[in-house]
Design a protein with these regions (language model features):
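Extreme N-terminal targeting/processing segments
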Residues: 1-35, 212, 218-244
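Short secondary-structure junction motifs
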Residues: 37-39, 193
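Short alpha-helical basic/polar micro-motif
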Residues: 10, 60, 186
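N-terminal export/assembly leaders
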Residues: 155-244
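Short N-terminal micro-motifs specific to bacterial/archaeal maturation
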Residues: 3-4, 137, 175, 210
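Short, small/hydrophobic-biased targeting/export segments
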Residues: 40, 46-153
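Short charge-dense sequence patches
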Residues: 11-14, 33, 81, 132-144, ...
């Protein structure tokens, strides 16, 4: 029998402790999105995208890990996005988040996202048409086609051009144009059954290209062929992206 001070035993225990930290951390990631997913009127699971047509003539595409509710107010029907990302082809509808309200013009197409791992606050991207935005604090402004803005309940950013491939996720793609690797990994992580971690040492590497979100592990392998990185996989569930 080995003694309690045996180096091999200590190494094994450290390994289990490290795995425990990873499991706890991973649980925290899923816990953050679990409650709104379970309680919302419309929700999507890991890797799922869902298309909806509402009675108001509104077509919606919900991205993975999205939670959306329908509310009836004195002003009419309102959608409330508590988590995730949605493509809106607008009829007569209003969409709100905790940070404000978005009112698309008729026949407009918008991507609206809220509380994403790589994005603080709410982001509105107008692909066509226009939209009016009213912040929770009361300020209002408008966006035209080709503009996007990110805001929280108190502040808003200056409108800038819509990101390349803003709606590519609808077709199962992530389009990156000099995107930080950390953000690419964060996006792929949402579509993968498991957890992907990106080492801060390589998180700032810039990535350009087209990647499948329906096959996130294949996309991780593709990244190793174009960047000086490697992927460490643990039990097929955990993946760590580190320097090669």
């Amino acid at each position: 029998l080995r003694s309690r001070n045996d180096p091999g035993r200590r190494t094994l225990l450290k390994g289990f402790a490290g795995l425990g930290v990873m499991l706890a951390s991973g649980y925290g990631v899923r816990e953050r999105v679990l409650l709104p997913e379970l309680l919302s009127d419309y929700r999507t699971a890991t890797g799922e995208r869902r298309q909806l047509t509402l009675a108001q003539g509104v077509d919606l595409t919900l991205d993975t890990h999205t939670a959306l509710d329908t509310r009836t107010t004195a002003a009419g029907t309102e959608l409330f996005l508590s988590l995730g990302r949605v493509l809106v082809s607008a009829g007569d509808i209003r969409l709100s988040t905790a940070n404000g309200q978005v009112l698309p013009a008729p026949r407009s197409r918008l991507v609206i996202s809220h509380n994403l791992p790589w994005q603080a606050g709410t982001q509105v991207q107008v692909l066509s048409g226009s939209a009016s935005i009213k912040l929770a604090r009361g300020d209002s402004f408008s966006l035209d086609a080709g503009q996007q803005v990110t805001f929280d309940s108190q502040t808003d950013s200056t409108p800038r051009p819509v990101t390349v491939g803003a709606d590519a996720w609808v077709n199962g793609l992530l389009i990156a144009e000099r995107m930080p690797l950390g953000q690419v990994i964060a996006q792929l992580n949402l579509y993968r059954r498991g957890v992907v971690r990106c080492d801060p040492q390589v998180a700032a590497l810039r990535v350009s290209g087209s990647f499948s979100i329906d096959r996130p592990d294949a996309s991780l392998d593709l990244l190793t062929r174009v960047l000086p990185i490697r992927v460490q996989r643990v039990f097929g569930y955990w993946a760590n992206v580190v320097a090669a």
